[in-house]
Amino acid sequence: MPPKPTYVSGGSVTQTGRSKWRLSYIPEFIWGILNQITFFFSTLIGGTVEPRRRPNNQGGGRRLAGFDGNGNVTGGSGVGGSGPSKGPDNGSNNRRGDMKNILACNSASGSUGPK
């Protein structure tokens, strides 16, 4: 058991320390509850806000090349994002997150999945 902290009262040093049931315990407990409630709601409200995205079926603007929903590389020419795919046309079936296939595709062997 750890030693009790020293407590100075009226100029004399004692080893008893403060009681667990002191009067200041009540407001400390109430402030602790209020802080927990505040932190809870601040995490719900204070998250990072991402900008709203326009649905894909609405035209306007030029779509940049990237990945479609299946992880394939897509082109981005034309209004509304339609255009030919600019990805490799060698039978690649890599998906985003499949690190084994990505590393095999980038290896010096030149093989990029089944052909």
UniProtKB/Swiss-Prot annotation:
Residues 104-115 have a biased composition (Polar residues). Belongs to the selenoprotein K family. It is found in: Membrane. It holds the Pfam family SelK_SelG. This is Selenoprotein K homolog. Signal peptide: none annotated. One of its GO terms (cellular component) is Golgi apparatus. GO terms for biological process: calcium ion transport; endoplasmic reticulum calcium ion homeostasis. It comes from Dictyostelium discoideum. InterPro entries: Se_SelK/SelG. The keyword Membrane applies. Keywords: Membrane, Selenocysteine, Transmembrane, Transmembrane helix. The chain crosses the membrane at residues 29-49. It is a single-pass membrane protein. Residues 48-115 are annotated as: Disordered. Residues 58-84 have a biased composition (Gly residues).
